[in-house]
Amino acid sequence: MNLIDKIAKDKSGLFSSGKGIVTFLNPYSYLVARKNTTLYESFDSIFADGALLSAMLTLLSGRTQRISFDFTSIAQDVFEYARSHDLDVFVVGSTQENVSKSVGVFRERFPGLIISGSRDGYFDSLSRQVFIKEMVQVQPKIIIVGMGAPLQEVLLKDLKLAGWEGLGFTCGGFLHQTAKFEGDYYPSVMDKLNLRWLYRMYDEPKLIKRYVISYPIFLVYFCVDALSSKLKRLFFKS
């Protein structure tokens, strides 16, 4: 699988079926995905999370929206969709303290939103099996998972394979960001200038190493994948 060919250009039709699993790639998780192609093939939708990946894809194959799971992007749509259709949401990830604070923010921000449950993202093998079995039994309509790549993707895939039939989203660090700032994480000026990456380095200095090391590597592999995609279309077009 060539990841470039799997990334959607926009969010049209996202809620049309009411089920499926959705994830998001930034330059760092793009490298993770390249090592786990079988895992990412199982996803119904993959979006470009971040201005750099979105810009690279736009240059390669036409305008590609930046779509991420936060309040500057698709999170607002997901919660509004759930509320307007009376769909229950289960939230899993981060620490118990953070997920509880996040749920409080969601309920305050979206009055009437049905949150049927939440739990932290730390499992042992037994508790993970119990959780998956419970989700299959109760069938929450939407599950949001914030455990970091690829753990969050593996959990959603396993839920789907076990028989859960709802709509699932990975959300990366969204839960702890929401808990920390009680709502919007990015200052509006940083969002408008597409400097969210810079703000994240300021807020979480541990990410500096990731940006400095991973992003140049991403550019190399993206160019390799872009060439592969172009050659595939050239020689195997119908």
Task: Outline where the language-model segments fall.
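Short, flexible loop segments at boundaries between secondary-structure elements
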Residues: 121-124, 164-201
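Conserved beta-alpha
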Residues: 54, 58-134, 138-139
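Proline-aspartate-enriched helix->loop->beta-strand connector
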Residues: 135, 139-144, 148-149
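Short hydrophobic/aromatic-enriched beta-strand-loop microsegments
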Residues: 46-48, 67-68, 112-118, 163-172
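A short helix->loop->beta-strand "cap" motif at the edges of active sites that frequently abuts
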Residues: 19, 87, 163-167
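Short glycine-rich anion-binding loops that position phosphate/pyrophosphate groups of nucleotides
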Residues: 27-29, 52, 147-151, 174
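A transmembrane-helix-recognition feature enriched in membrane-embedded lipid enzymes
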Residues: 54-56, 60, 185, 189-238
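N-terminal nucleotide/polyanion-binding subdomain common to many enzyme families
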Residues: 1-70
